[in-house]
């Protein structure tokens, strides 16, 4: 019987993947992705997906398995992760998408699919417009700065006539109760994390992130979640001649730090019962 699954959550650039690799090397297991951006095949460098040699050393799953045009929700991820929970290899589930972990350990509401015409309308709206249309309970529950989360909540409300919070309150049993897992959440000092973010983005540029963005440029669509990966809009703007590379670098680092701040707030609010890990 495999040991309890390991869950590793934390903000971007905190060192989650390194810990997952170490656990897998010492104890075995399969590393399963729980980061929305790392699921897309158009990015490896920019989203800090595991390197090819790391993937050869240890089994990895749900990395780069999605075409950029695919709309992928927490429900899709939960469906895809289920075989690894039932498999013989111990799953080491690692990532920074808090909603995935919440769906896994607290359950997911059975919300009807969103009609294509409603999604298309949402793609054309500004985040603030959609946010203003949400009920107060839903606004209080989601990350108001995350466009994907705001649009998802707006789509649910438009399609069903009910707020996302109301649907979530009817959530069924979780696939993996927290008591059945070894749950670790990274708690990294803000200044340390900010320095790591800057250093990592410079390493990404050196490793080919700009070339990655150049390959995406002909098909770039800012309405696609895949193309809203942190750093992508900034590098695309540079490639279009709108800003300098240095300005793109600074904007991407700022955006990453803002994202990390939102992640840390989420984790501290939603993962109080997880074991804190301070690298």
From Swiss-Prot:
Cofactor: Mg(2+)
EC numbers: 2.5.1.75
Positions with a binding annotation for ATP: 10-17
Gene Ontology terms for molecular function: ATP binding; tRNA dimethylallyltransferase activity
Site residues (Interaction with substrate tRNA), renumbered to this chain: 97
Catalytic activity: adenosine(37) in tRNA + dimethylallyl diphosphate = N(6)-dimethylallyladenosine(37) in tRNA + diphosphate
Binding sites annotated in the UniProt record for substrate: 12-17
Keyword tRNA processing set for record: yes
Any Gene Ontology biological process: tRNA modification
Enzyme class: transferase
Family: Belongs to the IPP transferase family.
Subunit organization: Monomer.
Protein name (database record): tRNA dimethylallyltransferase
């Amino acid at each position: 019987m495999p040991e309890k699954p390991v869950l590793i959550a934390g903000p971007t650039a905190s060192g989650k993947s390194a810990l997952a690799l170490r656990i897998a090397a010492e104890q075995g297991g399969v590393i399963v992705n729980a980061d929305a951006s790392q699921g897309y095949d158009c990015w490896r460098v920019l989203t800090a997906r595991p390197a090819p040699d790391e993937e050869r050393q240890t089994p990895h799953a749900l990395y780069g398995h999605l075409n950029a045009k695919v709309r992928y929700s927490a429900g899709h991820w939960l469906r895809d992760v289920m075989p690894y929970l039932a498999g013989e290899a111990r799953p080491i589930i690692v990532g920074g998408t808090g909603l995935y972990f919440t769906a896994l350990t607290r359950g997911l509401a059975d919300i009807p699919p969103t009609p294509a015409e409603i999604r298309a309308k949402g793609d054309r709206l500004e985040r603030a417009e959609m946010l203003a249309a949400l009920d107060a309970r839903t606004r209080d529950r989601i990350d108001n700065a995350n466009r994907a989360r705001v649009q998802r909540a707006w789509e649910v409300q438009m399609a069903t006539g009910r707020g996302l919070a109301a649907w979530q309150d009817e959530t069924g049993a979780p696939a993996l109760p927290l008591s059945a897992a070894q749950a670790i959440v990274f708690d990294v000092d803000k200044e340390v994390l900010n320095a790591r973010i800057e250093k990592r983005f410079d390493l990404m540029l050196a490793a080919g992130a700009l070339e990655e963005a150049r390959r995406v440029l002909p098909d770039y669509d800012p309405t696609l979640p895949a193309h809203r990966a942190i750093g992508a809009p900034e590098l695309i703007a540079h490639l279009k001649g709108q800003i300098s590379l240095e300005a793109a670098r600074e904007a991407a680092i700022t955006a990453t730090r803002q994202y990390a701040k939102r992640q840390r707030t989420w984790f501290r609010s939603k993962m109080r019962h997880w074991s804190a890990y301070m690298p």
